[in-house]
Each structure stands twice: as C-alpha cells, then as structure tokens.
C-alpha cells in the first residue's frame, strides 16, 4: 500500500478553504476518499452572520439535516432517483418551516448525508459520474432556497464510499468508518470549519442545536444511523414528521 498517499488523503482538513474576501460561491472539495464538502468561503460565512449574532456570545446554534427522505425525495416519491435532477422538497411544509426555525433564528444550516455509492478521489473527480451527479443536487437546493428567501448559506457534508483497491490517494478504513453516520466524524469536521470561520473561542451550542433525519430505528426505517449520529454528536434528534409537523 502507498502509505504516503494514505497520509496525504487523511491530512486534508475541512477547514482548509481559501480565504477569498470577495467570493461567496460555495467551494466543492474532495477530502481523500472519505468525504466531499460544499462550503462557503470562510470570510463569506463570517460576513453573513456578522450582524445577525449577539456580539457578546461565542455559541453557535446549528440546524442540521439528513438530505434524502428528510429534506428532499424523488419527484415520483420512489426510493431511488433517476438522476441528479430527479428531486423535490419532501413536502410543502419544508420551506416554510426552514424559514421559521432556521432562517429567522439565524442558525447555521447544515446537511450531513451518507453517500456510500459515490466513490471518488481528487484524481478521479472528472470521470466519476456518481460524483458529478452528487454535486448537482445541493446546488439546486440552495438555488431554490435563495430564490424564495434570498441568499442563505447551506453547508454540505457527504461521507463517500471506499474506492476499489489500487486507487490512490485513499483514506484508511478507519477514516471512512469514522466519517460515516452514525459515527460523528462529519460533525467534528463542521466544528473545525466553524472555528476557522469565526475563531477558536467559538463553540456549537449543543443544547440549542439539533439534527433531523429519517433513519431513526423505527418500524419500517432502514437504519438508525441518523438517530445514532445525533447521539454521538451530543445534540437533540428529531424525525422529519415531528420537526416539519407532518
């Protein structure tokens, strides 16, 4: 195994986002082979919240969500979509509730999703059809929010599947495991990114933050990964039916 390549893959930090003071467009980044992110440039996020938060407080309130079958679903309501454009908001309550519970309260909006079918490294980004498909949907979601409510930053974290043997640089099995829900690796990446944006003194207010997801271990749920993710991150958990009042 190419140990140097593995080290390089795991040494990439999610907070390593270019500080471009005039840029607001989110930046896609591939982290080794275990995660991809779509994050606003640091100065852009800091500028957005500058006049919205209490200057005396160093606590950040986060509203975090799973993506598929929580915020969105396929256009026909079937389990698997037919492409990156085959999506819609899960129901008509999603946007009004986000506006009320996230935007009005000036929370940081975050999506955490497991995408094990997407296997990608930086070198293979241009030839990975599934990665290209993955990068389309969050952009359309953000555009839909912006069109209705004006610009509001949306942070996106996706854990990705292991590449086939011989593909480098690749992350270790341990890193893949720790960044896949229900493990809390992606939450830790969010914490590092926010500290980079606002300063090392800032902390997520875990009592006032939460995670919403459909994989709660109920009868009919495919997994309990979302519930376990919230527990491992130390934040309250809600299922979409309760959060959106369905």
Locations of regions flagged by a protein language model:
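Acidic, Mg2+-coordinating phosphoryl-transfer loop and its flanking beta/alpha structural elements
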Residues: 210-246
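Metal-dependent phosphoesterase signature
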Residues: 62-92, 114-125
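A short, structured active-site edge motif that brings together acidic residues
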Residues: 135-179
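Short, flexible/disordered intra-domain loops and linkers
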Residues: 78-85, 119-129, 166-180, 217-224
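Substrate-recognition element of Asp-dependent hydrolases with the DxDx(T/V) motif
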Residues: 94-134, 152-165
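Conserved Lys-Pro-Asp/Glu-containing loop-to-beta segment of HAD-superfamily phosphomonoesterases
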Residues: 178-223
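Well-ordered, non-membrane alpha-helical segments in soluble/globular domains
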Residues: 85-97, 122-142, 184-189, 224-225
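Non-catalytic pre-domain segments flanking phosphatase-related domains
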Residues: 1-67, 75-79
């Amino acid at each position: 195994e190419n140990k140097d390549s593995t080290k390089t893959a795991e040494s990439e930090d999610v907070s390593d986002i270019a500080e471009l003071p005039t840029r607001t467009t989110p930046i896609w980044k591939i982290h080794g082979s275990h995660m991809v992110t779509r994050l606003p440039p640091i100065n852009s996020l800091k500028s957005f919240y500058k006049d919205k938060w209490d200057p005396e407080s160093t606590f950040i309130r986060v509203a975090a969500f799973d993506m598929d079958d929580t915020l969105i679903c396929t256009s026909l309501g079937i389990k698997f979509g037919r492409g990156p454009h085959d999506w819609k908001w899960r129901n008509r309550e999603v946007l009004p509730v986000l506006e009320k519970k996230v935007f009005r309260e000036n929370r940081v909006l975050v999506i955490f999703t497991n995408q094990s079918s997407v296997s990608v490294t930086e070198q293979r980004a241009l030839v990975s059809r599934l990665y290209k498909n993955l990068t389309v949907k969050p952009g359309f979601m953000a555009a839909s929010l912006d069109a209705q409510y004006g610009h509001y930053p949306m942070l996106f974290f996706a854990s990705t599947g292991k590449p086939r043997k011989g593909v480098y640089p690749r992350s270790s099995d341990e890193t893949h495991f720790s960044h896949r829900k229900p493990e809390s690796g992606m939450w830790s990446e969010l914490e590092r990114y926010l500290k980079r944006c606002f300063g090392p003194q800032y902390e997520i207010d875990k009592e006032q933050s939460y995670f919403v997801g459909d994989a709660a271990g109920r009868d009919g749920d495919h997994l309990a990964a979302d519930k376990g993710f919230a527990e491992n991150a130390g934040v309250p958990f809600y299922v979409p039916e309760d959060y959106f009042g369905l």
